[in-house]
UniProtKB/Swiss-Prot annotation:
Pfam families: M20_dimer (PF07687), Peptidase_M20 (PF01546). Disulfide bonds: none annotated. Zn(2+) 1 binds at H68, D99, E159. The active site is at D70, E130. It comes from the Bacteria. One of its GO terms (molecular function) is cobalt ion binding. The gene is dapE. Belongs to the peptidase M20A family. DapE subfamily. Homodimer. PROSITE patterns: ARGE_DAPE_CPG2_2. Zn(2+) 2 binds at D99, E131, H344. This is Succinyl-diaminopimelate desuccinylase. Its cofactor is Zn(2+); Co(2+). Binds 2 Zn(2+) or Co(2+) ions per subunit.
Length: 371
């Protein structure tokens, strides 16, 4: 089968300055391309965020593709305008080329090369709030689809998963993430008169050490050990002879599926309370750990990747969080996309040849789902 070329749509998408939460027409460009392929378009706007759901067909199997059109700020020092979509030496430059407008264009190209009268349903879940707080994006889309009984049966997310070569990695899970801001109050005073003061650091530091010294787990078959990192300690004190009035610290835990966010939050609070009674703990859970157990879905994806690249992809759970954490609560999900080495960097770029190869891989996935 001759694949459609993803490059023209990728360039059109890259020309939109869709830095979160701005869309700048990116989703309109995508909607126009999908409408031409017979998809119905449903616009979902929450707050400042634009989202769209595109759907074609009916019944089972119901396959979903999830992605985001928003990008991080470009920064400075690019060799080309980051929103000009310049092709040079076989590379397509632009903010979002890798993460992840390129993958969206590749999936649309795969759709364009295949009949529109397939059995079952194809849905695209596209948000403009993945790089930001992720409050009004994929999570809200899923809530809407769940309420209307229109959730996919399984889903592919086009995040850049590959490490060195296209085809080397499929993500089948992600670690959860929990952050804490701990504040201990004391009494300010002169260091020469400690009996007239109360040094909050002397309670905060033992609390932090107790947290740091705890081995949360030894890892699992699919996850590395959970990791707690202290990221800052602050008193706002610029004087070397003053005991501070308060001390605070920030920490983050990336945790595997042996834990839940609420359980870790309770552990943090209990540990801090033992060493620093009365301390305030402001805790936020940005995502739970999830795992799609290897099985028919991951095998289907792996076979499609191997058929195009000759590489058997590694099934992996490393890296940061993604919107797949929201999808996992509703259906099996895996992630596969481009090589991620240049994402979020100055001169983000994708080899045009890899973009076309990704379209072919996505096409092979569609062929296997709807054969």
């Amino acid at each position: 089968m001759t694949e459609a070329d993803p490059v023209p749509l990728a360039r059109d998408l890259l020309r939109s300055r869709s830095v979160t939460p701005e869309d700048d027409g990116a989703q309109t460009v995508l909607a126009r391309a999908l409408d031409a392929l017979g998809f119905s378009i449903e616009w979902l706007r929450f707050g400042e965020v634009s989202n769209l759901v595109a759907r074609r067909g009916s019944g089972s199997p119901h396959f979903g593709f999830a992605g985001h059109t928003d990008v991080v700020p470009p920064g400075e020092g690019w060799r080309h305008d980051p929103f000009a979509a310049v092709i040079e030496d076989g590379l397509l430059f632009g903010r979002g080329a890798v993460d992840m407008k390129g993958a969206i264009a590749a999936f649309v190209a795969a759709l364009a090369a295949r009949p529109a009268n397939h059995a079952g349903t194809i849905s695209l879940l596209i948000t403009g709030d993945e790089e930001g707080d992720a409050v009004d994006g994929t999570r809200r889309i899923l809530d809407h689809l769940a309420a209307s009984g229109a959730l996919p049966e399984f889903c592919l997310v086009g995040e850049p998963t590959c490490r060195a070569r296209l085809g080397d990695t499929i993500k089948i899970g992600r670690r959860g993430s929990i952050s804490a801001h701990v504040t201990v109050r004391g009494v300010q005073g002169h260091v020469a008169y400690p009996h007239l003061a109360d040094n909050p650091l002397h309670r905060l530091i033992p609390a932090l050490e107790a947290l740091r010294a705890t081995t949360l787990d030894e890892g699992t078959a699919w996850f590395e050990p959970s990791s707690l990192q202290i990221t800052s300690v602050d008193t706002g004190n610029k004087a070397g002879n003053v005991i501070p009035a308060s001390a605070s610290a920030r920490l983050n835990i990336r945790f595997n599926d042996r834990h839940t966010g609420p359980d870790l939050a309770a552990w943090i609070r209990d540990t801090v309370a033992r060493h620093a009674p009365g301390a305030a703990c402001d805790i936020g859970i940005s995502g739970e750990a999830f795992l799609t157990e290897p099985g028919p879905v991951t095998t289907l994806f792996s076979e499609a990747v191997a058929a195009v690249t000759g590489i058997t992809p590694k099934l992996d759970t490393g890296g940061g969080t993604s919107d797949a954490r929201f999808i996992a609560a509703h259906c099996p999900v895996a992630e596969f996309g481009l090589v991620g080495t240049s994402m979020h960097r100055v001169d983000e770029a994708v080899p045009v040849s890899e973009l076309r190869a990704l379209a072919e891989i996505y096409g092979r996935i569609l062929d296997r789902v709807f054969r």
